[in-house]
Amino acid sequence: MAKRPLGLGKQSREKKRKVESVEKKSDEPSRESTPVRSQMSVELDDDADLDDELAQLKGLWSKYFHSDRDDEYVLNGIVHECDRLLRLSEEDKEIKKTLNDIFHGIYALALSELTIFKAGDEEATEEKRKKDVSSFFENAIERVELGLSHFPESQFLKLVLAKIIFQRIPLEYISNLHLKSKDKKLDLVGQLEHGKKHFSIYENDTEFTFEILQMVNDLLDIVENFGREQSIQEGIDSDNEEEEELIDIELEPEHPVYPLQQSLEANYEWLRNHFDKLLDNTNTDMKIYASIANTLGELYLKKAEEPSKVFLSLQYDDGSSKKVSDKEAKNVQETALKHTKKALEYLEKAKLEDDPDTWVQVAEAYIDLGNLLDNESAEQEEAYKTAEEILGKANKASHGKFQDVLDNFLQG
C-alpha cells in the first residue's frame, strides 16, 4: 500500500507554527484608581477567612487566571490591592506578617501580565509601548527578587521568576528584532537558562506549572520559525498543502536569536522531560491531565518529523534523494518509529470520550505510523485499519465533521 496522506493532524501542526499576535486590548476605560473590593466579586476557597487580605488577593489572581484574560481590569485591581497592603504594612505589624511569598508572587505576576496589554496599546506610540513593556517587566522582576530576598527557599517565587523570564524573552526582546538585527549584549540563551534554573514542577498548582511550560513551548516555536511569519501566514490561508512548506531562514551568527536556534534540540528535550514529569505528578482524573498528555504527544510527533521526512524520501525515492546505505535507512526508520509510537502513547492518554477531535489526533498518528512501517507489511495494514476505524467513529459521532479527512485517507 502506498504512503497515506497525513491529513488533518499534519496540517494542523504546520498551521500552529506561527507567532501569536497580541490581541487588541479592550476599549473599556481603565479602573486603576477604583477601590478593588467595591467593584468586583471574588470567589474564595470554602475554608478561607472572608477578612483574610491574602485570601482575597489569591481570589483576585485566580479570577484572572481562569478568565479569558482579555481585560486588564482585574490585574489593575491586584496591583492596587498589593500597593494598599504595602502602605498599611508600614504601620501595622500584623498586616506586614501576612506579606508572604504568595503576596510577592501574585504582585509580580500581575505586573508581568500587564505587559501584554501595554504591548497591545494601539493608542500609544511604538516608543511608549516598548518603554512600558520594559518598565513593567523590570518592576515584576524587582518585586519577585525582593520576595526571594525574604523567602529564598520559596518554590513558588522561583517559579514566578521563571515565568516572567520566559514571557519577557519573546514579548520584549524577540518582538523588536528583525532579520538583520545584531546585539552582542542581548544574551537570550543566558536568560533562557536563568529561567530554566528557577523552574520546577510545582505540585501545589499543576495548572500554573503547565502554563509556564507552554510558554517555553511557544518560545521555542517562535525561535524556530523566526523570520518565517509571512510564509507561515500564507500557508494558513492556502488550501494547497505543498504551499505550506516553511522557508528556511538563515540568520547570521551575530543575530541574538541565532544561539537560541542552535540550542533548540536540547531545549525541546528539556521541555519534553519536564512535561513528562508534570504528567507523572498529575492525577488522571484531573481535567488538565489530557492537555498535558496531548502536548507531549504533539512534541513527540514533532521530534519524529525530521527522521520521518528522511525515511519517506528514501522509501518513495523520486531520484532526488541522497544515496544512503540500507543500514542508514533502517536506522532513520527506527528512530522515526520510536518517536511516533511514543507520541501515540501520549495521544491515547489524551483521548476524551466526548471530544472526537482527540480521536482524530490518534488516527492521524496511526497514519504517520503506517507510513513509516515496511510497505505492504501486516503491521502497516493494521495501523491503517486502526486509523480508518477511529476516523469512522469520529466522523459518525461528529455528524460528518471529518468526512473530508476520511475520504482523503481512503483515497490514498
Swiss-Prot record:
Indicate where the modification Phosphoserine is found in the sequence: 30
InterPro entries in the record: Nro1/ETT1, TPR-like_helical_dom_sf
The protein's UniProt keywords, in alphabetical order, are: Nucleus, Phosphoprotein, Transcription, Transcription regulation, Translation regulation
Q: Where is the composition biased (Basic and acidic residues)?
A: 17-31
The record describes the protein's role as: Required for correct translation termination and probably involved in regulation of hypoxic gene expression in association TPA1. Inhibits replication of Brome mosaic virus.
- Protein family: Belongs to the ETT1 family.
Q: What protein name applies here?
A: Enhancer of translation termination 1
Source organism per UniProt? Saccharomyces cerevisiae (strain YJM789) (Baker's yeast)
UniProt lists the gene as ETT1
